[in-house]
Structures are given as structure tokens and as C-alpha cells.
Amino acid sequence: MAQILQIAAIALATVGTGAATMSVMNEDIPDLQVPEGQWEATGALDGRSFDVLGVDTASGAVLEDLLVFRDDTFQSVDCQNYCDFGWSDYKTKEVDGVIHFTVTTICPDAPHTVVFYGQVNGDDITVDGTWTTRRWYWTNQIVLTATGKAMPDMAQDASG
């Protein structure tokens, strides 16, 4: 019985000092690093939507999505369907006639953060991104890259 009490005391002391927590936590994985610059909320892509096809760079899984811009906000239909991310503010800058954009979306109900960085040149779009899930015991990140084309009009409702 005394041995059981000793083990319980050691376990409580370990948990109480945080030693157990530190031994099981993974280091954080940073979100996608977006290039610095004069990012502004210009609405430059408002009224446009893009059908994109991409891949998870680690697994090769194919990712299909519709990216929608309206009223200075952005929505990934795939993110909306998965976790009700909603509409997020986006920022742009123009470099040599190409519109660069960035947006960070956060799931309100789970620890998911998605960072997009892309370029729109006419009707063509390229996008890089990270989907990071942070929990106290592990961090997982999906790195994605995608390309796509502008949709003819924004008749589709992405409000989810």
C-alpha cells in the first residue's frame, strides 16, 4: 500500500510541475510565411471566383476548391463545408500587373488555421497554403499548392 501511495505522489508531483506535459508536447509548426510588402484591403478581387485544383504536397492527395472574393472578404468553399470558416478579410498588392493576395482563415469551432498566399494574373490563379491544426498534444500541418481559372461569373452561392 505504501508503494502505491509513493507512485501516486510521484505522479501528482510530475503532473503538478508540468513535467509530463512538456514531455508529450510537440513544437509548434509555423503557418505559411507570406512575403512582406504593402498589403492593403483594396477589394481588387471582389466579384471574382476561381475553380482550383491542387495537391497536399506531403500525401499527393488531390484537393478541389472554389475560392470566392466579395466585399473585401474571401471564402474557400472547401473550408466552409469542413468547419464553417465563414468569410475572412483578404489583402492584396499589385506587382508588375499581377495581383498578389493573402488571407488567414480561422475555424470558430476547432483549432484550425488556414493561410493562403496567391497570385492572380488575368483569369489564372496560383495558390500556396497551409492548414494547421494545433492541439496541446500535437500539431499537424497540411501544405498545399493549387492552380486554377476564374469562373465566368459569381452566380454560385458560397455562403454555406
Regions found by a protein language model. Name each.
Residues I29-V120, D128-T130, R134-G160:
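Central antiparallel beta-sheet cores of small beta-barrel/beta-sandwich binding domains
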Residues A2-A20:
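Sec-dependent N-terminal signal peptides
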